[in-house]
Amino acid sequence: ANYFDVEAVSNSIKPGAYARLPYTSKVLAENLVRRATEDQKSIGLKQILNSENSQDFPWYPARVVCHDILGQTALVDLAGLREAIAAQGGNPSNVNPVVPTQLIVDLSLAVEHGGHEPDARLKNQEIEQRRNDDRFHFIEWTKKAFQNVDVVPPGNGIMHQINLERMSPVIHKVNGIAYPDTCLLY
């Protein structure tokens, strides 16, 4: 795979500075070199290399990980936008998240049956399904309707555990270019 030589670009601005950067700053610098306009790149890299924070610069996450409640709200907005575009004669299937979005359905299980009861977990999951049927139906629809949306169903763990243990690729490779994983937890 190919990659952007962030060290060379950084050292052309401030020789030797890249080697002294913390890892997180190197990831931000790579993101700027790969994605930003020349002006944004220049402003952002100078700030990173000089440990300054006088101006904002763009950051483009490789993916977004959403808790189901917050992510569902965003997907409802996208569904509404699709309806409006269709009403105007446009193609609603053109409305999709720009970056891969992972919706994790977690933390909605209410405990009605205790661990001493046979099949307590199964009974609690059945109650959860019944109480949240409309919500789960919408979430399942979004998985099929939108490109760039992946859904992790309930019962698989909490958001941070799932992200760290199962979802983070550490390095992405798209169109022959390798770059570090960056994630916005929403």
Regions found by a protein language model. Give the residues of each.
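Fe-S-dependent hydro-lyases/dehydratases of central metabolism
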Residues: 1-186
